[in-house]
């Protein structure tokens, strides 16, 4: 059973459609890269999956034990967010807020997991530092550790390497790849088609041309100079 299924989605703002009749599914262990032109609706799609936007038409369902509230999310940062005056530890552990319910504190286990996620992202030595004092790459690792606190199943990453230099970009991709190897499903928006084809198992291209399928099928379409259209949510490979 698919972890995530999008059926006949139409998305937009103020009555203006930007994505029409889009269908695809994501299985446990997939690494899906969402690519496409600027303004094609990639971030809107991701926010709709998270329940932050409502589709104009169609539906999104989760399965295989996944709940919408158990999806980890790394958003694009605004300038205000980059200047947020909180400690690294405070930001990372805030990833558990969706699981706290009405209790006003974090459990001992949540504190332990937050520390483990900081170690995994190699930022445990920064946990007392102020977030806004960190480099761009360090901030992205903090946000990835925070997203891990929200999930053990699926990560949604909105351009996680935007603005990073080549060395830090490579490190970030390596960390994400390792999380995928450990069993976490990854859905990532990217403008870097080369990296998408290196790391992803599946590609979703949205825009003037729409494609959903395996990266191998996508490569064949690229060589032919065209993309195959997705129909009815069929998984190509």
Predicted ranges, named:
Residues 130-134, 138:
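Conserved ABC ATPase signature
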Residues 155-158:
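Catalytic Walker B motif of ABC-type/P-loop ATPase nucleotide-binding domains
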Residues 190-191:
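H-loop/switch region of ABC-family ATPase nucleotide-binding domains
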Residues 50:
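Helix-to-loop junction immediately C-terminal to a conserved catalytic motif
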Residues 58-69:
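Conserved ABC transporter NBD signature motif
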Residues 203-216:
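H-loop (His-switch) and adjacent beta-strand-loop-beta switch element
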Residues 108-126:
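Conserved ABC ATPase "signature" region
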């Amino acid at each position: 059973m698919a972890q995530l299924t999008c059926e006949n989605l139409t998305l937009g703002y103020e009555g203006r459609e930007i994505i029409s009749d889009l269908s695809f599914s994501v299985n446990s262990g997939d690494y899906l890269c969402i690519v496409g032109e600027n303004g094609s609706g990639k971030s809107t799609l991701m926010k709709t999956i998270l329940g932050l936007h409502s589709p104009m038409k169609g539906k999104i369902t989760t399965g295989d034990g996944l709940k919408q509230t158990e999806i980890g999310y790394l958003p694009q940062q605004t300038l205000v967010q980059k200047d947020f005056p909180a400690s690294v530890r405070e930001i990372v552990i805030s990833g558990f807020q969706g699981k706290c319910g009405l209790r006003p504190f974090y459990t001992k286990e949540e504190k332990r997991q937050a520390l483990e996620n900081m170690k995994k992202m190699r930022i445990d030595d920064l946990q007392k530092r102020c977030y806004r004092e960190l480099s761009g790459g360090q901030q992205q690792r903090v946000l990835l550790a925070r997203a891990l606190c929200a999930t053990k199943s699926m990560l949604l990453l909105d351009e996680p390497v935007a603005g990073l230099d080549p060395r830090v970009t490579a490190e970030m991709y390596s960390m994400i790849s390792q999380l995928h190897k450990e069993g976490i499903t990854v859905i990532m928006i990217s403008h870097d088609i080369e990296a998408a084809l290196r790391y992803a198992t599946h590609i979703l291209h949205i825009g003037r041309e729409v494609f959903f399928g395996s990266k191998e099928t996508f490569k064949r379409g690229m060589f032919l100079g065209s993309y195959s259209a997705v129909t009815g949510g069929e998984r190509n490979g």
